[in-house]
Amino acid sequence: RSWFSFLGEAYDGARDMWRAYSDMKEANYKNSDKYFHARGNYDAAQRGPGGVWAAEVISDARENIQKLLGHGAEDT
């Protein structure tokens, strides 16, 4: 696998995560964030190693932001 293919997978994986986030905002259902986050992770991971990496980075950032804002572990 080439470095460029990894970067392409990561970019597409990040787009998958963004699409899930946008869909969550549009749906506007209470307590639906875990579903949409899981869907984004799954879609990104299907892209390959780059997508898995992007999903992990974005998920870790989400958890760290929630900790910083004082949300408990039940929200992650």
UniProtKB/Swiss-Prot annotation:
Alphabetized UniProt keyword annotations: Acute phase, Amyloid, HDL, Secreted
Cross-referenced InterPro entries: Serum_amyloid_A, Synovial_Prolif_Regulator
Swiss-Prot/TrEMBL GO biological process terms: acute-phase response
Tissues showing expression: Expressed by the liver; secreted in plasma.
Localization: Secreted
Major subcellular site: secreted
GO CC annotations on file: high-density lipoprotein particle
Inducers of expression: Upon cytokine stimulation.
Domain of life (superkingdom): Eukaryota
Disease listed for this protein: Reactive, secondary amyloidosis is characterized by the extracellular accumulation in various tissues of the SAA protein. These deposits are highly insoluble and resistant to proteolysis; they disrupt tissue structure and compromise function.
Protein family per UniProt: Belongs to the SAA family.
Role description: Major acute phase reactant. Apolipoprotein of the HDL complex.
Name of the molecule in the record: Amyloid protein A
Annotated source species: Macaca mulatta (Rhesus macaque)
